[in-house]
């Protein structure tokens, strides 16, 4: 796990933005209304609060900058040297020192003007002291413009640096430019480093991660190094030198066998000898890359002697090709194993191991006698082992069939199913049928139960249980069946009558309905009333006694009217109906009009008649005091 995370450094504002932010915050977070007729201690406190609040804002923001940026004396030497190469240690320390001085100056200015404000005897004098205090603070910050800009550039560059853990297991690639270092890291990790056929494509450190033996490894790709004195090396080359000097890693020195990088094998060997002091106490592997173009055996004797001398000194030489991936895994395995062994050896040499070993005691029992006591293996196990060696070949596994058949292989697990009827192996059984889970209705003993049922049925048939004649029904059973039929018919009739009564819609009261005499008589008869003497019934007598209704005589006019009223003129045809033939055509026109409006209503377009009152006085721009010299920013 990396101990440094430079991506969390807060943004460093420019001097102008710094001043604007702080003054705006003071205006927003402190009271803004004061009058000269207030008591003098209240006026002093009002302006003291503004000075102290501004000073505290500057102090907090500058302290945040100082605490976020790493201190070169406290971080790992690898990062300290890397920052010295990239940003110049003196310039970096000077910028942070100036920020620290500015913070102390702001604190002193606030302290002095708060002391002076205690003697202010009017609103005007207190206000002028406040103006002077805030002005001096802003001037101090304005003078730090270059330091703030430099620190912001450093912050941006630091946040883009790869996260390298100096203490974890690391493989470090180095060598001349364009020898295949970036191609190698792309093969062994998921890093996507740009690869081009020209030198110095990689201009900074790149990191990729991989797994080996269930451990996490980081692979660092360094920029190419040229063979010249240290003081002549540029910033790009010095990054590689810094990584070689400080990272405890297995070093992979990559050499180009084909010499397509523009440097011969002798030059690459001279660079190796030049930076060899950086390889002390580190596992080293020489990677002879681009063997797909030319191999060591195809080189001249003089060039072959270079690699033989390296092997004689104890450095393993492995031929690789990142194009065909030949030897890449071998290099990775060899480097990782050597680094693991080196780390264990280093820990064993340390004092911490001795402290632990002193607390450990290995108990070894004394030998009782010289009698041999080999492990006991039963004879059955030995015999079975012999049979396994001699007997017929093993049954082919599905994996063996897959390798044998290749693309024609199809995994079929149903062929191993043990069913009573082998033809049912490939029957399709649905999981869900008509909303029910089929597995819930499957009984393992279903066939056994079916056989028992079939035997029971055979016994019943043999006993003559199903031989009864259907025509042997007596008269009593016939009467029961006839009565049941009448009951069913009556039930259906009742249902129909109930449906008639439950008709929807307006109902006419019973008293308002016209009653037919014949219907009334039939209803009475059905209820059991004797209707033989119906002429003397009360409704017949009442009908004879009642008078016939006299019709009112139509009134006639005795005198003809003096004037005749003019009939009302015909109304003008409505516009939405005019020009249409009949009612059907009117309905069709309205339907078409609604369809045409649907799209416009759905989109909700703003029309010419839609009014909108704009906010003519936005509060965030017009709130607060607007005095002379302030209107350019409000």
UniProtKB/Swiss-Prot annotation:
PTM-bearing positions, type N6-acetyllysine: 103
- Which tissues and organs express this gene's product? Ubiquitous.
CDD domains, sorted: NOG
Subcellular location field: Nucleus, Nucleolus
GO CC terms, sorted: cytoplasm; cytosol; nuclear membrane; nucleolus; nucleoplasm; nucleus; perinuclear region of cytoplasm
Q: Which UniProt keywords apply?
A: Acetylation, GTP-binding, Isopeptide bond, Nucleotide-binding, Nucleus, Phosphoprotein, Ribosome biogenesis, Ubl conjugation
Phosphoserine is found on: 122, 468, 470, 472, 558
User: Could you tell me where the Basic residues compositional bias lies?
Assistant: 544-554, 586-604, 619-634
Indicate the cross-link positions, Glycyl lysine isopeptide (Lys-Gly) (interchain with G-Cter in SUMO2).
103, 332, 534
Q: How does it assemble?
A: Associates with pre-60S ribosomal particles. Interacts with MINAS-60 (product of an alternative open reading frame of RBM10).
Protein's recorded name:
GTP-binding protein 4
The gene from which this protein is expressed is Gtpbp4
């Amino acid at each position: 796990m990396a101990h440094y995370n430079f991506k969390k450094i807060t943004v460093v504002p420019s001097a102008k933005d710094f001043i604007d932010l702080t003054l705006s915050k003071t205006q927003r977070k402190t009271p803004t209304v004061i009058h000269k007729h207030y008591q003098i201690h209240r006026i002093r406190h009002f302006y003291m609060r503004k000075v102290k609040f501004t000073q505290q804002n500057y102090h907090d923001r500058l302290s945040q900058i100082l605490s976020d940026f790493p201190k070169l004396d406290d971080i790992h030497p690898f990062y300290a040297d890397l920052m010295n190469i990239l940003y110049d240690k003196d310039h970096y320390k000077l910028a942070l020192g100036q920020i620290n001085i500015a913070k102390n100056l702001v604190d002193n200015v606030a302290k002095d003007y708060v002391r002076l404000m205690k003697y202010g005897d009017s609103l005007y004098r207190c206000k002028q002291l406040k103006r002077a205090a805030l002005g001096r603070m802003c001037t101090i910050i304005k003078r730090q413009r270059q330091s703030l800009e430099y620190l912001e550039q450093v912050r941006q560059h630091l946040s883009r640096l790869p996260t390298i853990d100096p203490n974890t297991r690391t493989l470090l690639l180095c060598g001349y430019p364009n020898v295949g270092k970036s191609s190698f890291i792309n093969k062994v990790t998921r890093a996507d480093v740009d690869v081009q056929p020209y030198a110095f494509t990689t201009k900074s450190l790149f990191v990729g991660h991989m797994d080996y033996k269930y451990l996490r490894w980081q692979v660092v790709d360094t920029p190419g190094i040229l063979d010249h004195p240290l003081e002549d090396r540029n910033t790009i080359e010095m990054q590689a030198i810094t990584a070689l000097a400080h990272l405890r890693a297995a070093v992979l020195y990559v050499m180009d066998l084909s010499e397509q990088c523009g440097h011969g094998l002798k030059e690459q060997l001279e660079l190796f000898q030049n930076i060899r002091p950086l390889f002390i106490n580190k596992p080293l592997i020489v990677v002879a890359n681009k063997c797909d173009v030319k191999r060591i055996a195809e080189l001249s004797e003089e060039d072959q002697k270079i690699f033989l001398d390296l092997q004689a000194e104890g450095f393993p030489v492995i031929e690789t090709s990142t194009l065909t991936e030949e030897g890449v895994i071998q290099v990775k395995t060899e480097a990782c194993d050597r680094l693991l062994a080196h780390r264990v050896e280093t820990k064993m040499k340390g004092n911490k191991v001795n402290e632990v070993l002193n607390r450990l005691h290995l108990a070894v029992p004394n030998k009782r006698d010289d009698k041999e006591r080999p492990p006991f293996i039963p004879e059955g196990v030995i015999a079975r082992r012999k049979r396994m060696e001699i007997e017929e070949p093993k049954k082919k596994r599905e994996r063996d069939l897959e390798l044998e058949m290749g693309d024609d292989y199809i995994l079929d697990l149903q062929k191993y199913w043990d069913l009573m009827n082998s033809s049912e192996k490939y029957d399709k059984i649905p999981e869900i049928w008509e909303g029910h889970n089929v597995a819930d209705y499957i009984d393992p003993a279903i066939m056994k139960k079916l056989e028992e049922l079939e035997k029971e049925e055979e016994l019943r048939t043999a006993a003559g249980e199903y031989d009864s004649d259907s025509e042997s029904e007596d008269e009593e059973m016939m009467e029961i069946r006839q009565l049941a039929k009448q009951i069913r018919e009556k039930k259906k009739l009742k249902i129909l009558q109930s449906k008639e009564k439950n008709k929807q819609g307006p109902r006419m009261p019973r008293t308002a309905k016209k009653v037919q005499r014949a219907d009334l008589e039939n209803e009475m008869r059905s209820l059991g009333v004797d209707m033989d003497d119906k002429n003397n019934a009360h409704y017949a007598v009442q009908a004879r006694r009642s008078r016939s209704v006299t019709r009112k005589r139509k009134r006639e006019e005795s005198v003809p009217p003096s004037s005749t009223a003019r009939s009302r003129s015909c109304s003008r045809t409505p516009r939405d109906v005019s020009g249409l033939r009949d009612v059907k055509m009117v309905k069709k026109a309205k339907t078409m009009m609604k369809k045409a409006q649907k799209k416009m209503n759905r989109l909700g377009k703003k029309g010419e008649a839609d009014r909108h009152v704009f906010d003519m006085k936005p509060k965030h721009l017009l709130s607060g005091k607007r005095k002379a010299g302030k209107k350019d920013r409000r």
